[in-house]
């Protein structure tokens, strides 16, 4: 039986999730999307994408719903998740990608409205579990976990990197900088914002700002709790980011040894499609549209004694959305 999916919030991640499910040929039926705008606008933004290009599938609006390749997707415009007809529509799993309902109590409204599970496409609070595919997904327990966070795009990039280095060398402490594409949470032109750096024009500045990614690593790798911190510098690209991690490890090592450990991990079954390895001298454009969570750049590794610096690229929209599809399939495979 195909698992029925509802998407709450059809923005960058909601739409990329839809495209990723199509691209993967996932055994998931997206039956409804909820967003506070017109079906025409949602259909147009699904079909035409400034980063991902034009969708080859036919996309139309009929009777207020979106029709993709003949499949009808019901369009809802409900502000309060409690009022969504998930039960009536037979929705099994809700993708919560509005960015607003990241607290468990708010996400619970989807379950009260008839859904079985909620996957939050962001760091959450009071969630049953935070999962990074390839790092701690085997801890998923369908009996205990109903509200699940897929963490952030940056935690999905950092997680595999930190796991491999910690398993191989032991991380004592470390600091991370992510050089990150701008997002809709920044201003296009200078204007008020509660973060006075994000207040500034996104497309013409390097914007230092917070990221919870390093601290959140303790949620998926408890042995690293309190050992990592960092921040982001948002830069003028629409997608395509890089995580730069510098750690003190438990013993002296070399560039060759660090790269060999990451190559071995990237080639292993455990990290297939999640952690990949490149020795090509790439730039951010080269990884746009890459579905991996973490694209390790071996040419950038630096080592001095027991101090190690590594860099992994990620398409913060597409890679993350593909992991959200993978997580949905994991949860779907264990539905009662």
Describe each region flagged by the PLM.
Residues 230, 242, 246-336:
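C-terminal active-site/capping subdomain that shapes the small-molecule cofactor and substrate pocket
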Residues 22-26, 163-171, 181-184, 211, ...:
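Generic secondary-structure signature for well-ordered alpha-helical cores
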Residues 144-145, 201-203, 240-244, 307-309:
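Short, solvent-exposed beta-strand edge segments and adjacent coil->beta transition regions
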Residues 1-199, 302, 326, 334-335:
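N-terminal Rossmann-like NAD(P) cofactor-binding subdomain of oxidoreductases
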Residues 66, 131-133, 147, 188-189, ...:
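Short clusters of hydrophobic/aromatic residues that line enzyme substrate/ligand-binding pockets
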Residues 12, 16, 20, 44, ...:
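Alpha-helical scaffold segments in soluble metabolic enzymes
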Residues 10, 14, 103, 151-154, ...:
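Generic structural signal for well-ordered, non-membrane alpha-helical segments
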